[in-house]
Swiss-Prot record:
Coiled coil: none annotated. It comes from Saccharomyces cerevisiae (strain ATCC 204508 / S288c). It holds the Pfam family PAXNEB. Present with 358 molecules/cell in log phase SD medium. Keywords: Cytoplasm, Methylation, Nucleus, Phosphoprotein, tRNA processing. It comes from the Eukaryota. The modification Omega-N-methylarginine is found at R13. Residues 1-11, 57-66, 432-442 have a biased composition (Basic and acidic residues). This is Elongator complex protein 4. Pathway: tRNA modification; 5-methoxycarbonylmethyl-2-thiouridine-tRNA biosynthesis.
Length: 456
């Protein structure tokens, strides 16, 4: 340990003692300040400012970045990730996907485990929703847009366009009410003095009858504020379709493009990309109904090298034009091998599996809902992959949580619950009751004397 003197300067190569500081006038530097090409504020030319702003590229990002108009009726932000999302045509399918639709640049595969074709209904709904979006924008005031949605169908079935479902207009009673309300809304000489019909007389005569009005509103049901706000902001985002009607008029070539899957893979991919480029600034919805159907695909397409090459190319196009392309495909998994199915699932961002009920389960549901046939469900819905969430590593796999039913008017997906058969329960209770009653009788009646003879 070393000690230094109090006046010694540390790390000084000069003298050891530190003298007092000398104060004097400030020194003037011999080198002038480097001012450069400074200008007074306000003397910058306007041309230089405009040139700098152009380099910043602060234009309308909704058109340059997304490739779509910000006012597109078929696009809304995802409530989970805020990504631009479009509807699949089924509100229930939009809900279980987790984004209220399918995010742009993503794909969904709907697979079915039997020979039924419930998946074809979802494919038609997906295509019909795109046609409706295109016609809504085409009927706007801006006639130069010529629509903002285009549908590409990879299929040989030319009747697919004529089989698209129409928009649900309500029941017969609701349609009659709508016609009556439209007639009453028209201003004519007859209904000028009939405006009092809109308010029932009991609300005018009895002041205390306001509570009956509230009771009627509760009975009829009123939507929540959030639902009202969402519906008012995105009123044309999703539509309810009637699968018993047809979309009229049928889609034309400017709205829907057919591509034959019997062509070579390179030709199919080039035609898809040309269609995407030709319909610039439009939302492209690619539909592949009944993938690998033997009636539409050649035998060589069932080889893994061919079909995986096709789906890999389509997936690359979806990711290349991610700002305005979505993909929907459906397949029956009974006609392909399990290894090929695994490879196909890896090509899609989301996978939904439909498992129709067998005959025994169908008969059980028909017996349980004998008085309510509208509640009969037709199968289970399994969620194997979800868009965006699965890519993030979130294992959102749900099996036997949802069920689907193909109703008279629409395709529905709802939560699954095993129903209780009241007939079996009542029969079991009656049997147990009769058994207990016979036991009571046997206990009350004295036992008869029995005589047993033993012969040796």
């Amino acid at each position: 340990m070393s000690f230094r003197k109090r006046g010694e300067i540390l790390n000084d190569r000069g003298s050891g003692l530190r003298g007092p500081l000398l104060r004097g006038p400030p020194r003037t530097s011999s080198t002038p300040l480097r001012t450069g090409n400074r200008r007074a504020p306000g003397n910058v030319p306007l041309s230089d400012t405009t040139a700098r702003l152009k380099k910043l590229n602060i234009a309308d990002e909704s058109k340059t970045k997304m490739g779509l108009d910000s006012s597109h009726v078929g696009v809304r932000p995802s409530p989970a990730t805020s990504q631009p999302t479009t509807s699949t045509g089924s509100a229930d399918l939009d809900s279980i996907l987790g984004h209220m639709g399918l995010p742009l640049g993503n794909s969904v595969l709907v697979e079915e485990q039997s020979t039924t074709e419930f998946h074809s209904i979802l494919g038609k709904l997906f295509a019909a929703q795109g046609i409706v979006h295109n016609r809504i924008s085409d009927s706007s005031a801006d006639k130069t847009r010529n629509g903002d949605t285009h549908v590409i169908v990879l299929s040989l079935n030319q009747m697919f366009a004529k089989e698209l479902p129409g928009i649900y207009k309500g029941s017969r009673k609701q349609m009659k009410k709508n016609l009556i309300s439209e007639e009453e809304s028209k201003v004519t000489v007859q209904n000028l003095n009939e405006t009092q019909r809109s308010t029932p007389s009991r609300y005018k005569d009895l002041k205390i009858a306001w509570k009956y009005k509230l009771a009627d509103e509760k009975r009829l049901g009123s939507p929540d504020r959030d639902d009202i706000q969402q519906n008012s902001e995105y009123k044309d985002y999703n539509h309810q379709f009637d699968i018993t009607t047809r979309l009229m008029p049928a889609p034309i070539a400017s709205e829907l493009t057919f591509i034959a899957p019997t062509q070579p893979v390179s030709t199919i991919l080039s035609q898809i990309e040309q269609t995407i480029k030709r319909n610039d600034k439009k939302l492209i919805r690619i539909v592949i109904p009944s993938l690998l159907h033997p009636a539409m695909y050649p035998p060589k397409m069932f080889e893994s090298s061919e079909i995986i090459g096709l789906m890999h190319g389509v997936r690359s196009l979806v990711k290349k034009y991610y700002e305005r392309v979505v993909l929907f495909a459906s397949i029956s998994i009974d006609i392909i091998t399990p290894p090929l199915l695994v490879l196909l699932r890896n090509m899609f961002d989301s996978v939904i599996n439909l498992e129709p009920f067998n005959q025994e389960m169908t008969e059980f549901l028909e017996r349980v809902y004998k008085s309510q046939p509208g509640k009969i469900q037709h199968g289970l819905v399994h969620i194997l992959k979800l868009p965006v969430f699965t890519d993030r590593g979130e294992m959102r796999v749900l099996k036997s949580e949802w069920a689907f039913k193909n109703g008279r008017k629409k395709f529905e997906i709802e939560q699954w619950g095993i129903p209780v058969d009241d007939a079996e329960g009542s029969a079991a209770s009656e049997q147990s009751h009769s058994h207990s009653h016979s036991d009571e009788i046997s206990h009350n009646i004295p036992a008869k004397k029995t005589k047993i003879s033993l012969d040796y």
